[in-house]
Design a protein with these regions (language model features):
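Alpha-helical segment of the N-proximal tetratricopeptide repeat
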Residues: 75-106, 119, 167-174
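TPR alpha-solenoid repeat register
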Residues: 113, 147, 164, 198, ...
Length: 317
């Protein structure tokens, strides 16, 4: 028997001094109220959407809180922010920026739209402006260095602002401010020693400076922490290739391919090594496969060079 039936049955079976008409009025009121309560219970998602200022954190390997967990009590800010997220996911960056700007105007003390604004500028390769947005978010959040002291490095959820530091480091790397970027990555590693991403980014920053031996060490650390992640295996292979360690490089590329066989980069890199070793048939095989996965001018140019070398070798013979 549901709640409504129970209440009606209790009412009808209880002696009362009310006349029949009064009972009908009271009974109708009870039905209206209880039905309303049932509707609220059956549709509690409506309430949760209205109060969407603090959605639950998305699951991740290190249980970090999402940026949205910063929260806001301003409904207009929340709606503009959510609209911005939809535009960002659709890669409609101009509209995303407008929405995030509106959210910031509605609630200037909410860091989440500042962070996403920075991420949008990052996608547009406007790294300087992205960093300005991240720094404004830091200003809203307060002194994070003080909050660092309360972080449990091995257990429990990690704070959302670790991601902001990482994003700022990536922007600094793209601006070739490698020392500043590596300093941020080092700080992240000290806070979360089990996170592979900063090690991979350190390797990339070192590689950009031609410090390939040091880069190999950084990529090694990334692969140890996340052995199923193809990117550091591929990057390690390229750093090894740059130091002339072709066999080790090929082994790293093979590992990347085994983890992500439809990714064109390690296939291209294998082809480049065989091209440099004058093994043109092997080089052609891998480069053609890379092209079948993704059309790329750089890959097409390498294939043309391989074909030219093959024709030249055939003519000489």
């Amino acid at each position: 028997m549901n709640v409504l039936s129970e209440k009606i049955n209790d009412y009808l079976s209880t002696p009362s001094s009310c006349n029949f008409f009064q009972k009908l009025v009271i009974l109708g009121t009870m039905i209206f109220i209880i039905s309303g309560l049932n509707l609220i219970g059956d549709n509690d998602y409506v309430f949760s959407q209205v109060n969407a200022s603090s959605p639950p954190p998305s699951p991740s390997n290190n249980s970090q809180q999402t940026q949205e967990s910063l929260g806001s009590t301003n409904r207009d800010a929340i709606l503009s922010y959510e609209q911005g997220n939809k535009f960002l996911n659709a890669k409609n960056y101009d509209q995303a920026l407008i929405s995030y700007k509106n959210a910031i105007t509605f609630d200037p003390n909410w860091a989440a739209p500042l962070i996403k604004q920075g991420n949008t500028y990052f996608e547009l390769a406007n790294y300087t402006t992205a960093i300005k947005s991240y720094d404004k978010a830091f200003a809203v959040l307060g002194n994070l260095d003080e909050k660092v002291k309360s972080i449990d490095k091995n257990n429990g959820p990690k704070p959302y602002w670790l991601d902001i530091w990482f994003d700022k480091g990536e922007a600094l790397t793209n601006l070739k401010k490698f020392d500043d970027a590596i300093a941020l990555y080092d700080k992240l590693i000290s806070l979360d020693p089990n996170w592979a991403n900063p090690w991979n980014s350190i390797g990339w920053a070192l590689q950009k400076q031609g410090k390939n031996d040091e880069a190999v060490t950084a990529f090694d650390n990334a692969t140890k922490l996340n052995p199923s992640w193809a990117k550091p295996w591929n990057s390690k292979g390229w750093a090894l290739y740059k130091t002339g360690k072709f066999d080790e490089a090929l082994s790293s590329f093979d590992k990347a391919i085994s983890l992500e066989p439809k990714w064109d980069k390690p296939w291209f890199n294998k082809g480049k090594i065989f091209y440099d070793l004058d093994k043109y048939p092997d080089a052609k095989q891998f480069v053609e496969h890379a092209l079948s996965l993704k059309a790329d001018p750089k890959t097409s140019a390498l294939l043309e060079n391989i074909n030219a070398k093959t024709e030249s070798t055939t003519t000489v013979e």
